[in-house]
Amino acid sequence: MKIDTLYQPKLSASGKVTVAVCFAFLGNAAVAANIEAIGQTSVQQQHNVDIVNIAAPTAQGLSHNQYNKYNVSQHGAVLNNALSAGKSQLAGNLSANKNFQGQTASVILNEVVSKNPSLILGQQEIFGIAADYVLANPNGITHNGGSILNANRASLIVGTPTVSDG
């Protein structure tokens, strides 16, 4: 018995159009909603880069941010940990994080609470004061070509974090 190692399905013209349309919609969906925050955390875009105004930290310095989706495109994402305006490496001029009350985060916990896995394709930057970075997603994390700027330490965790005394 001979097994072909290269399988090439034969599609009709309408089948090829259908496949092309499906891929077009999938591509637009991935670009349209990279990061969807819940609660105090907010997201906007500047120069195609997602800017995340992280939640105000606790007295111990933990900024606990929850998301329905946490994906980073090739354009990147910036986590705003700044008390004053300045220049981001990825997004240019940014203002201070409006959620802060005089204290920056020492640990930025990014927790995905939905059924969506995370796809990290680009750089992430902690703008302002350097902090520890944690991405926790029990549904999985694919990291392909991404990096993290201005982080003291970084952890990608496939699981659900437990926070105590945070």
Residue ranges and their predicted role:
Residues 2-16, 21-166:
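Solvent-exposed adhesion/ligand-recognition segments of exported proteins
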